[in-house]
Amino acid sequence: LNTTTLNLNTGAPNLTFRGYKRKNGDVGVRNEIWIIPTVGCVNGIINQLAEGLRRETGGKGVDAIMAYPHNYGCSQLGDDHENTKKILRDMVLHPNAGAVLVVGLGCENNQPDVFREFLGDYDQERVKFMVTQKVGDEYEEGMELLRELYAKAIQDQREDIPLSELRVGLKCGGSDGFSGITANPLLGMFSDFLVAQGGTSVLTEVPEMFGAETILMNRCRTKELFEDTVKLINDFKEYFLSHGEPVGENPSPGNKAGGISTLEDKALGCTQKCGTSYVEGVLPYGERLKVKGLNLLSAPGNDLVAATALASCGCHMVLFTTGRGTPFGTYVPTMKISTNSTLAKNKPGWIDFNAGVIVENEPMEKTCERFIEYIIKVASGEFVNNEKKGYKEIATVSYTHLRAHETV
């Protein structure tokens, strides 16, 4: 990247990263093998299978071998069940996975055969199913399937991919008084740059937008998108109010200790993460991206739930700003950007990029140029801290106001 000629307002032509081109034309930034359960009853099995393949292969030739346990897939009904199915489907189809083994029990609500149909078109050489009640030794059967998948995945090679194919999620957590001054505006500048390149950014954690939602509404490309954004906000507000919960009591103890006093403070910082671009799409929870540019996604503020939702809509990585610090990660690279240099110094095993230099007289534009360079490195294979440490988890919503059958 030649930063001397970089124009952050219009983008720079022909920027690329080294990614994986999938059979269906989609692009990934990782080539991993995932083991995904249809139901929580088989969590122990999938963990053993992942460990078995790592031990047998040493993980050579792929970026990671991961099991993703969860607690759902049974004892769920209606929208709650549909939301779980959608997130699991999105994972199976995610381009950061070079191969996926779906493991079911057999008697669960999330029936493996029904879930297979729910996937739609998928690469049957890269996605395999095992129903544990129908096989004798589930470990040996699972290992045989994983060996087949591994043999396919290790053939994949990185190639030059236009930056216009990159999709990033925008998230904050453990925010402080510097969030709206350093890291969040930095993400906004990067988001505008990526959109100018033809790429995609996605903003979520809807309850964090309360108090600054009109900023987003005024930037909707069409009347329909404006109406979708109004519904996105109001659905969450109505959910809180219907349960007698005060909408304004969002800031956490950590937020307040860090200098954020009101929900409006927090919301103004939250919305800065998406820059000044027009809103081009509004997505229901569990739905996948359909248009490039800036999108809004229906998901709560909970860090792991929201980050999982961002990955599931198709984001290749999550850019996560924090003033207090957090180690977590979801199933795509979860990059931590500190709002202050003290955090970056004290937690180098958590923080990947320090935006605190912005209040130490480094121009925002220079910081953003370094940030772009770093993101291209990560998209091309450099691990962030949550990947190095194996902090990778998933979480889904367990309430039903995020209606699976409606578009917002």
Identify the role of each PLM range.
Residues 2-267, 314, 324:
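Buried, small/hydrophobic-residue-enriched core segments of structured protein domains
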Residues 91, 284-345, 356-359:
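Hydrophobic alpha-helical bundle architecture
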Residues 238, 245-260, 264-305:
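Active-site rim loops that border cofactor/substrate pockets in soluble metabolic enzymes
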Residues 344-372:
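A structural-propensity feature for long, helix-poor, extended segments
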Residues 367-383:
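C-terminal transmembrane module of polytopic membrane proteins
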Residues 125, 169-170, 209-216, 286-291, ...:
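Short acidic (Asp/Glu) and glycine-rich catalytic loops that position anionic groups and cofactors
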Residues 382-396:
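A short C-terminal boundary segment appended to hydrolase-like catalytic domains
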Residues 400-407:
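Conserved small/polar residues in nucleotide/adenosyl-binding loops
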